[in-house]
Amino acid sequence: MTYGTLYPYRTRMLKSLLDSGINLKLYGTKPNRFYDHSLDTANQNRFITGEEKARLLYGAKIVFNNMHFAEIESVNNRFFEVNGSGAFQLSDYRPILKDLLPIDPELVSFKSIDEGIEKIKYYLEHPNERYEISDKIYKHFVDNYTYDHLIKYIINLVYR
């Protein structure tokens, strides 16, 4: 499963997932630009929010998060949404993942689409490993990345 805005790089990656036989569900409205109709079979053509989004994230076997290439030093909001929902996420590798995750980021990230496809297929065949990883990450995110934590962090920055 994935959701969000499509752009050329992301569209090519999603097409590669489908071409490799991965069952993909794509949420969000069809954009006027950068859309490839080969994604039609995966596209749910539905914008998701709130409880529905949380339910779909948690119910997905794997949430695929390929971040915008401009996010070289950071992660996107989806990274926090997915990990905070308890879902299993596979995302683009970023060096900052070492600081954000309680596990080796290599376990839940990819540096190429081929590596991403390989890891998706691996984790689909190893659900218990997927559950253990997502549970560990979820607990870490609840302990460290809630809005309460963010507010305290901002207040500390402001009043230094």
Stretches with model-predicted labels:
Residues L107-I113, Y123-P127:
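Conserved acidic donor-binding segment of nucleotide-sugar-dependent glycosyltransferases
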